[in-house]
Amino acid sequence: MKKNNSPQKNNSCSRRKFLSSLGAAAGIAMLPFSKSGGLLANSINDNLGYEAKVAVTEADYYSRELIRNKVQHLFESLGGISDVINTSDKVAVKINLTGGSNTRNNSRLKGADVRDTVWTHPEVLRAVCELLIDYGITAKNIFIVEALWDQASFDNFGYKEITNDLGMQFIDLNKPDPYPDFINIPTGENKFYYESFIMNPILNEVDCFISIPKMKHHYSAGATHSIKNQIGAVPLSKYNMNGQFGHRASLHNEGGDQSTHLPHSIADLYLARPLNLAINDGVKNCINAEGPWVQGYENAEYGILLASKDAIALDTISTYQMGGDPEGSTLELPNGNSCLNYLQMLANLGYGTNKMSEIELVGDGVDAIVSVKPAQKKVMPTGFSLSQNYPNPFNPSTTLLYDVPVTERVIIKIVDIKGQEVETLINSIQSTGSYEITWRADRHASGVYFCTMQAGEFIDTVKIMLTK
């Protein structure tokens, strides 16, 4: 995983300036690591060995102007989106409104807005769709889609207003409307369990399928991002069991053990209808569960937005950011058990990459991505701690271990003997766990350095020695 953190002096611009850049961008041949030429610019991967690009930006709150500018920056950092969408295309945008309108009353939210912590935030939806329209997509050819738990979740929380304001259409995937009936969309010869899925025909008709999930842990699937969001692409009535409306029990349990069958279902849904573009909402979110109906749920604020044309790569970085191991054969569940890793399954079939070394990070938020991995500890930490680095002295890299007992923003920096900041290794929200981080000091001179960790009221420092 390489971070392209070229400085972005100003990632906000006026609507007029942005629109004027669209006409010029198509004729600009951009070099790698440069600021992109606008939404119409072609994606450039060059021969750098990367299989995918994930754009990252930071945002701490959901103001309309901020989110609009941030999503625009994501698209530009990807080199534009003209390689996945044309102005004449029909586009489906899948949101996540899991749990329905009554979720807002759950005590585990602790007063938080359900749109902030559990659902796709309406301002992220608005920003994506406004940019699509600015790009040239006809508004009536944009379809907001979701299999609703109840109509109120769409009508009363801003999603209907956005759809109407922009002149788009909404389709409830629980129903065949506006078509006469559902259709079966095949998964193909690489299926894991299902040969086809019953779906609204709109998912077969659109040229571009976009997923805008909420960045979350999942109690049964480990992580839920853009690909897991597709569980909500099939009608509830066709995949429940024993009349359990609201829960697609057959997708969880029909094939036997849930830790195997649910990942198979998720992967098969992607085979039936792959994504063309994904934007992950992690400005505010939740950890340890996908919703407050699960014991252990906690509100969180990761403060980031991510986007990619490779949904597997996007979910890989998102899973990694939330403390998971996206490269393994299994994903850890919040209760300590594990399930099959559907990212690995799809990557093995060539639908994208879940290898960190094959993913280039771009955008002005790459430093928010945690350059750490979970340490192999079985006991959850009881207090914050920062351990001495090893090896020490070192050249050119060294590893530090640290513990996070509760969800908290963790800041880890390297400073020199004069107290001058050399590098920020971490500045992001992290969930409970033990972690290890590696610092590469190739660019720095020999000498004494200090690594400082701050988390809430906790502050600690260790002395480290670089010898060359």
Walk through the language-model features, giving the residues of each.
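N-terminal and secondary-structure boundary signal
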Residues: 2-370
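Ser/Thr-centric signal marking residues that sit
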Residues: 120, 398, 424, 461
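Glycine-centered coil/turn sites that cap beta-strands in beta-rich domains
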Residues: 371-390, 394-413, 436-442
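Short, glycine-anchored, charge-dense loop/turn motifs used at functional sites
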Residues: 415-422, 449
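Short, surface-exposed loop/turn motifs with a glycine/proline- and acidic-biased composition
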Residues: 426-461
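Short beta-strand edge segments in extracellular beta-sheet folds
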Residues: 465-468
